[in-house]
A protein has these predicted regions:
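Short, conserved catalytic or interaction motifs in soluble domains
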Residues: 45, 64, 71
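Short alpha-helical DNA-recognition segment
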Residues: 23-45
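Short, charged recognition helix plus adjacent turn
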Residues: 2, 70-79
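DNA major-groove recognition helix of helix-turn-helix/homeodomain DNA-binding modules
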Residues: 53-68
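Alpha-helical residues within the helix-turn-helix
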Residues: 20, 31, 60
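A short, Lys/Arg-rich alpha-helix, primarily the initiator
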Residues: 1-21
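Short, basic-rich loop-to-helix N-cap that marks the start of a DNA-contacting helix
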Residues: 47-57, 78
């Protein structure tokens, strides 16, 4: 099992990785998501316990599925 903070940090790192791969700044990404830049920054640093609704918004904005967005963060082996 992954510690709560670890999963938030891993999720934030994944969001940052995908955002940067698309060449988006935090500000531009936040605007596309309809979320505040400081909120996105907190998510990326693992400081926000993100709501499932916002996970969906982020995934759609990044053009990935929720499972692609969360890939590799649970600490469990993918099958």
């Amino acid at each position: 099992m992954v510690a709560n903070n670890d999963i938030l940090i891993k999720f934030g790192n994944r969001v940052r990785e995908l955002r940067k791969a698309q060449g988006l700044s935090q500000e531009a990404f936040a605007a596309r998501c309809g979320l505040d830049r400081t909120y996105i920054g907190g998510v990326e640093r693992g400081q926000r316990n993100i709501a499932l609704r916002n996970v969906e918004i982020i995934a759609k904005t990044l053009n990935v599925s929720i499972s692609e967005l969360t890939q590799g963060i649970s600490g469990e082996q993918q099958q």
